Amino acid sequence: MILDAGFLISVDRGERTAQEFLTAALAHDTPLTTTHPVVAQVWRDGARQARLARFLQSVVVVAFDDGPEVGNLLARAGTSDVVDAHLVVVAVQRSEPILTGDIYDLESLTSALPERQPNVFNWP
């Protein structure tokens, strides 16, 4: 499962829904992944984000090294959100669904894909 910023914010705030999701993901051996650009969106002060820092140690954080693929997807979709486009590219590469609070933005990107479209689920 590829995690967008909304979920990481929920973790950072200690929201019960995030904890329940994490418990279920662990019980079902669901791999959790996010990206460095998503982390950059939510990271503000490590001293005040201990919960988020601990969480990030337990997930795969994918580097942003897919610039041409992301740019091509943005061109096809006619949009400009690099972070969202990178999430979609990573989801396709890993064959994993996306969990996001911006379902419509991501669906506009996934619909621009020439082939495999990852599933996109709304959070919360």
Residue ranges and their predicted role:
Residues 1-34, 43-55, 124:
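Short, well-structured N-terminal submotif of metal-dependent ribonuclease cores
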Residues 41, 51, 69, 108-109:
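Phosphate- and divalent-cation-binding pockets in alpha/beta enzyme and binding domains
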